[in-house]
A protein has these predicted regions:
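Membrane-spanning alpha-helical segments of multipass transporters and channels
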Residues: 2, 7-241
């Protein structure tokens, strides 16, 4: 009857077909992942973090040897902008040389491969100029205390840049300051330049760095202007016994 006819209609699968159907029922959904712009090794992955760190330290050391405000320009009564540029251009030039030497070593000695080598180097020239301008202003405005501020700002940038782990895993304070510090944008842009990807963050970083550079130079010029104005306190400093 009906049961007999139904039993004859049950498909009789062979072992291979049974195994295939069992696998489908056991794992009905499969996830296929395809990495985009994957870094080939840890060195390439960490390069966007350590390259700007070295440029910041290089500018910091340069201003330990070069005064942030050119004394000769101050002495002859030059304009404040000329004084600021006279103190910034030598360190910016040193930053360009440092960038060229650093990337040559990373590429030919370490084996760093860059998806956009020319863009990476040009971008790092801007980074070196920006970092030099920021450090110049801190030293020109705050004197010896500026060196402490330079180190403090470096620590804040290292902990909020998201260079080692996603910044979202950091405490809320570092998430809050992340978008407002230049190194955050530098790290994000270098990832796109070294391993590939959308260039939107690169152009944003260029705009941010240009703004920081212009603002820092303007503040340095203001500090130079203040140095040119003599006050009673500067003419007659308090005596200390």
């Amino acid at each position: 009857g009906g049961l007999h006819d139904g039993a004859e209609r049950i498909p009789d699968y062979d072992k291979e077909e049974r195994d295939r159907r069992t696998a489908v029922m056991a794992d009905p959904v499969q996830l296929t992942s395809r990495p985009l712009h994957q870094a080939p090794n840890y060195g390439t992955g960490f390069a966007p973090y350590f390259i700007p760190l070295s440029l910041w330290v290089g500018a910091m050391v340069a201003y330990m040897l070069i005064p942030p405000l050119n004394r000769r320009a101050l002495a002859v009564g030059a304009s404040s902008w000329r004084i600021a540029l006279a103190g910034w251009l030598p360190v910016a030039a040193i930053g360009v040389l440092q960038t060229a030497a650093l990337m040559a070593v990373l590429h030919w000695a370490v084996g760093l491969e860059m998806a956009r080598a020319g863009g990476t180097i040009a971008f790092l020239f801007l980074v070196a100029a920006c970092f030099g301008a920021i450090i110049q202003w801190l030293n020109a405005r705050f004197g010896p205390a500026g060196r402490i501020l330079v180190l403090a700002l470096l620590m804040l940038q290292l902990t909020s840049a998201g260079g080692t782990y996603p910044v979202q895993t950091s405490p809320g304070f570092f998430n809050a300051i992340h978008p407002f510090l230049p190194m955050s944008h530098v790290v994000d842009a270098l990832r796109r330049l070294i391993t590939g990807g959308d260039l939107g963050p690169v152009w944003l970083a260029c705009a941010v760095l240009t703004g920081f550079t212009a603002a820092a130079l303007a503040l340095t010029a203001l500090a130079a202007r203040r140095r040119q104005v003599w006050t009673l306190n500067r003419l007659h400093p308090e005596l200390s016994l």
